[in-house]
């Protein structure tokens, strides 16, 4: 190797070291805002998978199903699919409230009346053994009514935000309502659910 080539190699090595050092310094600079989920991958859920959950719900009469539960640093984010059939009048004590998990609904199809409000009548703790409590939305309460609740007429395309602690109550469903649910879990009370776990769940026959 000639002296000129050696000099070029050394120079390139020095530049690479300086560049790497600058990148590392930029990444760990304590004065900059830092990602709350550093180096976390994104999550993609295809429509075909969401549709498979809806088909399973209709075939097996399942209301609520968790598609994913994802770690995003300071919280878990759950993605659920919900299918509710016709409802002429609400069932007794069917007001729901979750202490720690907030929910966002995006209505896919159907129409329903949903009552929202924080003042729950005849509040009763939900059993801690319920699958929905353990896997989907954490501890909370049921109730018989929502005092001064506000009724919303939901239809396809609508979005509803339900903070933790707010009562929500379907009082009428015209034929059905199908909605995608985003569950925001800052206390990480719900277990994570991966794509592989989702596929295994969908592959199970009815009753398993």
Where are these regions (language model features)?
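Bacterial N-terminal signal peptides that target proteins for export
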Residues: 1-12
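Bacterial N-terminal signal peptides
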Residues: 11-21
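A short, N-terminal "cap"/entry segment at the start of jelly-roll beta-barrel domains
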Residues: 25-99, 192-200, 204-208
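His/acidic/aromatic-lined binding-pocket segments of jelly-roll/cupin-type domains
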Residues: 96, 102-106, 151-152, 159-160
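Short, conserved beta-strand element in jelly-roll/cupin
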Residues: 99-114, 118, 129-141
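Conserved metal-binding segment of the jelly-roll/cupin
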Residues: 153-173
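A short hydrophobic beta-strand segment most commonly corresponding to one strand
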Residues: 175-191
